Amino acid sequence: MPCLKITLAYDGSNYAGWQVQPEAHGPTVQGEVAAALKRLTGEEITPVAAGRTDAGVHARGQVISFSTRARIPVERWPLALNSVLPADIAALEAVEVAPDFHARYCAKRKWYRYTIYNNRVPDVFCRRYSWHLRQPLDVIAMARAAAYLQGCHDFRSFCAAGSPVRHFERQVQQASVSQNGPFIYFDVIADGFLYHMVRIMVGTLVEIGRRRLVPEAIPAILAARSREKAGPTAPARGLCLERVEY
């Protein structure tokens, strides 16, 4: 049975995250994709995603995988899916892969970007995709702090309390802060992420940008291995899964 790897983009604003869960309040991206697949194939398919994005988080390069008996040519899959998916979910690319391919477990690294709109006046067209902060932030200090997040660390301080994860070590290949006009971007590439990890990183960097913490506080926060030592969790709406590499 052929296995397909499909790249998706979606606006997560109206979804209770990627994963279908009994307690989910509202539709999920996985649920919408599964419903679209059933319409196309008649099969009950549970697509697997590279990143199980939270409620309100977006994606430009989410990757899913699934097996199907459908005889749709691989190059026609994006067009077929887009004909039955909601307007805020789009299939971008499809390729056939080995039967043992798994979108999550085969991923080598993921790139997330968090967007802050740093301006006194809000931008109504960006409000769903950025965190609006009126107070000017010290971007240079934030960039210095981000560099300390690179490398292999125990990121327990940057994991939401109550996470069932046992192993907190992750390898961060890149963590950087850049600015383009009123937009401040935090880009992070890692082999994996803990629950709310990127959003807690951003909340901590904003505390540094507000000069409530110094950049050199990051090593101590990492060493503490305590969620209480890091900053608040940034809103979901500014976060986007940009790309998954295999």
Curated annotation (Swiss-Prot):
<dbReference type="Pfam" id="PF01416">
    <property type="entry name" value="PseudoU_synth_1"/>
</dbReference>
<dbReference type="GO" id="GO:0031119">
    <property type="term" value="P:tRNA pseudouridine synthesis"/>
</dbReference>
<comment type="subunit">
    <text>Homodimer.</text>
</comment>
<feature type="active site" description="Nucleophile">
    <location>
        <position position="54"/>
    </location>
</feature>
<keyword id="KW-0413">Isomerase</keyword>
<keyword id="KW-0819">tRNA processing</keyword>
<dbReference type="InterPro" id="IPR020103">
    <property type="entry name" value="PsdUridine_synth_cat_dom_sf"/>
</dbReference>
<comment type="function">
    <text>Formation of pseudouridine at positions 38, 39 and 40 in the anticodon stem and loop of transfer RNAs.</text>
</comment>
<comment type="similarity">
    <text>Belongs to the tRNA pseudouridine synthase TruA family.</text>
</comment>
<dbReference type="GO" id="GO:0003723">
    <property type="term" value="F:RNA binding"/>
</dbReference>
<dbReference type="InterPro" id="IPR001406">
    <property type="entry name" value="PsdUridine_synth_TruA"/>
</dbReference>
<protein>
    <recommendedName>
        <fullName>tRNA pseudouridine synthase A</fullName>
        <ecNumber>5.4.99.12</ecNumber>
    </recommendedName>
</protein>
<dbReference type="InterPro" id="IPR020094">
    <property type="entry name" value="TruA/RsuA/RluB/E/F_N"/>
</dbReference>
<dbReference type="InterPro" id="IPR020097">
    <property type="entry name" value="PsdUridine_synth_TruA_a/b_dom"/>
</dbReference>
<feature type="binding site">
    <location>
        <position position="112"/>
    </location>
    <ligand>
        <name>substrate</name>
    </ligand>
</feature>
<dbReference type="GO" id="GO:0160147">
    <property type="term" value="F:tRNA pseudouridine(38-40) synthase activity"/>
</dbReference>
<dbReference type="InterPro" id="IPR020095">
    <property type="entry name" value="PsdUridine_synth_TruA_C"/>
</dbReference>
